[in-house]
A protein has these predicted regions:
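Surface-exposed beta-strand edges and their flanking turn/coil or helix-capping segments
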Residues: 11-13, 22-25, 52-55, 129-131, ...
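Short acidic, gly/pro-rich beta-turn/loop elements at beta-sheet edges
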Residues: 8-9, 18-21, 33-35, 89, ...
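Conserved alpha-helical substructure of the radical SAM core
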Residues: 44-78
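N-terminal [4Fe-4S]-dependent radical SAM core
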Residues: 1-25, 60-73
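Canonical Radical SAM [4Fe-4S] cluster-binding loop centered on the CxxxCxxC motif
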Residues: 14-58
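Short, flexible active-site-adjacent loop segments at beta-strand->alpha-helix junctions, enriched
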Residues: 3, 14-16, 27, 85, ...
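Conserved AdoMet/S-adenosylmethionine-binding subsite of the radical SAM
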Residues: 65-170
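Short, low-complexity, polar/charged sequence segments that are solvent-exposed and flexible
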Residues: 5, 17-20, 28-32, 45-46, ...
């Protein structure tokens, strides 16, 4: 929960040797209303707020404390930014969070251990490639524009061709 009692989703994904954390970047989703992805429960929730970089980092700290409390010695070695919210609509805070993740004096996670997921906002994908450059996961849902328009209405604004071109740039 944040200071206003908003629930913030964070997920730990265990494997034999380590844990992966899935963090959220928003309470609700900027793609809600007319742009909501039809399959996504978060898309039914109006955007309450973008999470700050420190609120995203706090998810990592809470997860580490949880693991310690339960005696889990496996480290959190990977971070996937694909919880609640569209990552690229909270660009600056997500970029700052990733910078903190990679700081040697901080969490010290390598670029190859971090993946950002997006439904595809072409200009932000290109900017992210130039400024950040961690792994990128595209929620494609369909290679057909007509089908994708129904599943992810934002596709009408950012058609598949533009999204794919931005991914090639990436």
């Amino acid at each position: 929960n944040d200071e206003n009692k908003n629930l913030i989703e964070v997920v730990l994904i265990p494997s034999k040797s380590h844990n992966t954390i899935c963090v959220s970047v928003q309470v609700g989703c900027a793609m809600s209303k007319s742009s909501a992805c039809i399959h996504c429960a978060t898309g039914t929730q109006l955007l309450v707020k973008n999470l700050s970089a420190s609120e995203i980092v706090m998810q990592m700290m809470i997860a580490k404390r949880y693991l310690n409390d339960f005696g889990d010695q496996r480290l959190i070695k990977n971070c996937v930014i694909m919880g609640s919210g569209e990552s690229l609509t909270n660009y600056e805070n997500v970029k700052e969070f990733i910078k903190i993740l990679m700081e040697q004096e901080g969490i010290h996670m390598g670029k190859k251990s971090i993946t950002l997921s997006t439904i595809g906002i072409p200009d932000k994908i290109k900017k992210f490639a130039d400024e950040v450059g961690v792994y990128l996961a595209l929620s494609l849902h369909s290679g057909d524009n007509a089908k994708r328009n129904k599943i992810i209405p934002i596709n009408k604004k950012y058609p598949l061709k533009e999204v794919i071109e931005s991914c090639k740039y990436y």
